[in-house]
Amino acid sequence: MELNELQQQRLAKLERLRAAGIDPYPPRAQRTHTIGEVLAGFDQLMDRGEQVTVAGRIVGARRVLGKLAFAHIEDESGRIQLWLSRGDLGDEWFDRFRDDLDTFDIVEASGTLRRTQRGEPSVFVTRMGVLAKSLNPPPEKWHGLSDIEERHRQRYLDLIVNPEVRDVFRTRATIVRTMRRFLDERGFLEVETPTLQPIYGGASARPFITHHNQLKQDLYLRIAVELYLKRLIVGGFERVYEISKVFRNEGVDRTHNPEFTMMECYQAYADYHDMMRLVEDLYRALALEVTGSTTIVFQGQTIDFGPAWRRVSIPAAIAERTGIDILELTELEPLQEAIRAAGLKVDLKPGWGRQVDELFSVYVQPALIQPTFVLDHPVALSPLAKRRPDQPLLVERFEPVVAGMEIGNAFTELNDPLDQEQRFLEQGRAYDAGDDEAQQMDVDFLNALMYGMPPTGGLGIGIDRTVMLFTDQPSIREVILFPHLRPRE
């Protein structure tokens, strides 16, 4: 590895430490208190004259003023000032601090606690040690790494210099923990299903493909867990859920990452109305846990999860916004003729269902700011959902939308094996016609349905987008620790 000038200077300091018999990467630390513990009990510890040992990374500039020196160190729990005097610390380590230690080094310091004349809590250091010498200097503006792509490529550095980023991922953990507790308390059983699958299904997406050498078989990283969870409903589990990574070989943008986290749950003897109530209760619980209130602010918009969510029908909303009645234009060509005649600026899609989805995505969804259930999806887009009895072109399905962003998907699940077989055959014809996101025939899943699956409601929630909402982040990359990026050129 070729080192630049600043790295070489730091390497020389490391070698001086080693030459003096000091291990710059010792195996153990002597820490007695976190910085947060010291700050929380500062006055009591100070009054007792208790010796503490803290450890952390040197942040900010070090100051050396004759026989005194100052630095701040930071651990995950907080930041505190170190006060070093040549008399208390001794010549050797005072000189080492001055000459051989740098910003970003990880150190430990022992001493008693006092406040400075300005009232700042400080450790008056009597012993010091190096725990990890940093060979990389901080970025130019160490207090804030601002290049967005570099922040995502070097998330470790982003977490060092932008402490607020750590708060995003603490909130993410709170959301996942709260979601688990919410489902557990309602009698759902957490399960695990295969990541490598012989047939991909449960969503309309392109898969990632790998190969099992021993079995001489192509396998797919899962694009959803739906079909396995519904097999469990057939098997007699009445409420199941899984929180897992799923993988879709698709583009990367503000709300999409090829690897993302989903929560899927299924409830026997329920339908999509039950799933709506579950979603309303879940997001109210998340808001209260994260913010203490049912309201949040996302990108300047105040969102209220307290009231019942609005219901919006796709055909009615498209008619209101564009003047096109999709239920009167149930073939692709007449629908696209109407789009052209109306001068609507949307991409022309292969398939009536996809064209309806495009109209809704462009002309309706961006305006849905408050929590909304989007209902009445075309059956062509929903091969796993039960048809509406009164309108066979549509299904019992909803997508929860908040701040113009789809955050999930839910159905009354299709449990008729004969209807499901016909849907799979239609998907196969679409695939043969060039739709590479069409779903595949899954004979084993059909066999499971033939044993009988009770009426079932199913729900999938995008955890990454949910975290975006509750942390007010504009991009999915900000809520994934290590998002996928293009290779460096």
Curated annotation (Swiss-Prot):
NCBIfam families assigned to the protein according to its UniProt record, in alphabetical order: lysS_bact (TIGR00499), PRK00484.1 (NF001756)
Gene Ontology biological process terms from the UniProt entry: lysyl-tRNA aminoacylation
Short name of any one Pfam family annotated for the protein: tRNA-synt_2
A Gene Ontology molecular function term of the record: tRNA binding
Protein name: Lysine--tRNA ligase
Cofactor info, note text: Binds 3 Mg(2+) ions per subunit.
Subunit structure: Homodimer.
Any single GO CC term annotated in Swiss-Prot or TrEMBL for this entry: cytosol
The enzyme's E.C. designation: 6.1.1.6
PANTHER family tied to this protein: LYSINE--TRNA LIGASE, CHLOROPLASTIC_MITOCHONDRIAL, LYSYL-TRNA SYNTHETASE
UniProt similarity note: Belongs to the class-II aminoacyl-tRNA synthetase family.
Cross-referenced PROSITE patterns: AA_TRNA_LIGASE_II
Keywords of the record: Aminoacyl-tRNA synthetase, ATP-binding, Cytoplasm, Ligase, Magnesium, Metal-binding, Nucleotide-binding, Protein biosynthesis
Residues at which Mg(2+) 2 binds: E406
Cofactor: Mg(2+)
Residues bound to Mg(2+) 1: E399, E406
Enzyme class label: ligase
Gene name linked to the record: lysS
Signal peptide annotation: none
Catalytic activity line of the entry: tRNA(Lys) + L-lysine + ATP = L-lysyl-tRNA(Lys) + AMP + diphosphate
Organism: Roseiflexus castenholzii (strain DSM 13941 / HLO8)
Subcellular location, record wording: Cytoplasm
